[in-house]
Amino acid sequence: MKKSIFALPACVALTTLVYADAILVNGPMKFKPIAASAYQQTTTDQLILNSEPWVIPGGFTQRIISDESNLDIYPGASDWNDMNTINETGKYAGQYLYRTHEVRPSIGPYLGGAISMVDLKTGKAQVLAQRSDWEALDGLIWTPWQTLLFAEEVFAAQLPDPDAPNAQSGMLYELKFAKNDPTVVEEIEVRPMLGSLAHEGIEIDEEGNVYVIDEDRKGAIYKFVPDNFGDLSSGQLYALRVKNGAKTGEAEWIALDMNQAQINARIAAQAVNATSFCRPEDLERIGRTLYAALTCEDAVNSANTTGPGAILAVSLESVPRVSYFVQPGINVPFEIRPVDTIPGVTGFKSPDNLAKGPDGKLWIVEDNDNSDIWVALPDEDEDGYSDGVYLFASLKDKTAEGTGIYFGEDPYTLFVNIQHSETGNDKTMAISRKKHKSESGD
């Protein structure tokens, strides 16, 4: 096991990270880690929060792509911009940014869940699809067969889908576009075979298998194997089970009762003793490794459901292996928030969303006060852990949450949303690196 270089005694109080002055993280998004979370920069100044809400490294800029001034889907309430993706393939590839909106029926009057679209060339933003029975739309991904998959993060459905009326939790949907036009919706179908769950992360491998999670404090990780590539109407859903009752080590995918999975996949997973993790949220695949953000995981005490969180790695081989890739106290500090005049310790807490960086690094954003964005290096020494986890950005908007981190075609630009902002103006932003003309590569 990697030596615990970040385990700090309770008496230590630091606001900066010890490596901030010594490290340069290379790649297209080359950066010097920022010194600390935005504890000292927290503000309610609307001018700042609507223009430069992030503390970012030198050599980077931040700008708004779309906010509620050019598209206000839910007047009088936050739009809850959540996940991002672009049309990654096909005609006009890279031109359109799609977003889910994590709005729930508790707001009134409820106008229904929505997917919006931003033309990255013109800046025009519009609703792509909206339906009165959609709740808390969250996960979103562009498929290799040029459709969108999106899903509801719902534990107990208040507005059942008319085509899946017995489902007890959230559903996953597939949006199909008109031929050669990624701005026109041709059809939207519910995909109950992928389970009724509190969905968030969605990932797809080279074989067309789809991975999903259940965002429960005892949530499982799932794999759907379709009968035919690109056809999600039939197939088998599996849940991940680590052998010998452990959380890490050799694992297997266990087939679920498909009738039960379409009603409540959580119950189906529990019936086969699938391994539970504390609030699995987003998923990201890099090569043959699937990463999962575990928001409240305690890697030391599995009974604790209020842990600091961790990043899990699952190898997508014939015999999967499961390990903690980012673990507070091992390769990143624990966070200790400042109290009154006592300074805090900048650290890792409540990881939520993940993104594959342009050079294969894993990007992580927290669901936490002063949401931090971290970058985890690959595990080159093969000990299971990232070889380094570095602080890229931190949010000055304390009541808000950074979410939906995503890289499109431009390797120098990170998309990120800000939801439930102090300003009441939820937004989608781009954080970009200024590339010098003298650079021939990174």
Regions found by a protein language model. Give the residues of each.
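Sequence/structural signature of beta-propeller domains
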Residues: 20-442
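Gram-negative bacterial Sec-dependent N-terminal signal peptides
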Residues: 1-19
